[in-house]
């Protein structure tokens, strides 16, 4: 309570390692604080499951609080974070549910594959133009393979250079279609998403993205 340092230790950012250290600490632990970061949420899940009251502190607020320190070292930063936690001078970051993160991962995976498909389509278009071959504008992702494959196969040199690229794009597109089906299936089995999709213009992707972003609407009360 008086802010005295009882122990300092370098520990790997692993749930089991942190829990083992806290269990062997020998003093009552009222709260555990983590600065917001890539691993913070995963560590929070594990620590909370182990029974520790854990909060994630907003990184910019922590950085601002530590900015007045003259000697910036990992040890001094850790001490500063501990003091921020002790005094309560921090902004807590809401930790989204695992379900929300799984949904966001599915959406991000789908988006990444679509982006790669578009990049490869544009690459093929650009390379074909050098030889006077212009694929029509507005060509959808589905018909693209057939439209590009025909002129490529008519030229042995082009086929040698571009068919591997076209095959990779096709595989990516097929993987994208599978993820797209999974996203829509997930949305169609979620009561909140079904309600959101009754709004004109709101489809499965928008509904699921909003659902995952909000996670628990009760946190806004």
Question: Across the structure, where does each feature detected by a protein language model lie?
Answer:
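Short alpha-helix plus adjacent loop in nuclease-associated cores
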Residues: 55-108, 147-151
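Catalytic palm subdomain of template-directed nucleic-acid polymerases
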Residues: 208-218
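A short alpha->loop->secondary-structure connector
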Residues: 5, 48-54, 70-75, 128, ...
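Short, intrinsically disordered, charge-balanced linker/junction segments flanking boundaries
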Residues: 1, 217-221
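Glycine-rich, often acidic, oxyanion-interacting loops/wings at catalytic, nucleic-acid
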Residues: 107-195
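Glycine/alanine-rich phosphate-binding loops at beta-alpha junctions
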Residues: 1-55, 64
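Histidine-centered phosphotransfer motif of kinases
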Residues: 199
């Amino acid at each position: 309570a008086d802010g005295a340092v009882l122990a300092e230790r370098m520990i790997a950012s692993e749930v089991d390692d942190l829990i083992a250290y806290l269990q062997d600490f020998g003093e009552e632990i009222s709260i555990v604080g983590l600065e917001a970061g890539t691993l913070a949420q995963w560590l929070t899940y594990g620590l909370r499951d182990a029974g520790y009251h854990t909060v994630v502190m907003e990184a910019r607020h922590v950085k601002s609080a530590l900015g007045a320190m003259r000697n910036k070292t990992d040890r001094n930063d850790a001490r500063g974070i501990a003091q921020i936690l002790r005094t309560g001078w921090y902004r807590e970051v809401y930790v989204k549910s695992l379900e929300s993160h799984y949904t966001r991962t599915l959406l991000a995976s789908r988006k990444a594959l679509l982006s790669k498909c578009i990049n490869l389509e544009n690459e093929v278009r650009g390379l074909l133009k050098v030889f006077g071959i212009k694929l029509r504008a507005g060509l959808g992702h589905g018909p693209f393979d057939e439209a590009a494959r025909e002129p490529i196969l008519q030229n042995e040199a082009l086929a040698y250079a571009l068919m591997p690229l076209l095959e990779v794009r096709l595989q990516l597109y097929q993987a994208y279609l599978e993820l797209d089906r999974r996203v829509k299936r997930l949305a169609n089995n979620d009561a909140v998403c079904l309600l959101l999709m009754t709004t004109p213009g709101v489809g499965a992707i928008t509904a699921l993205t909003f659902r995952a972003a909000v996670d628990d609407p009760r946190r806004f009360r």
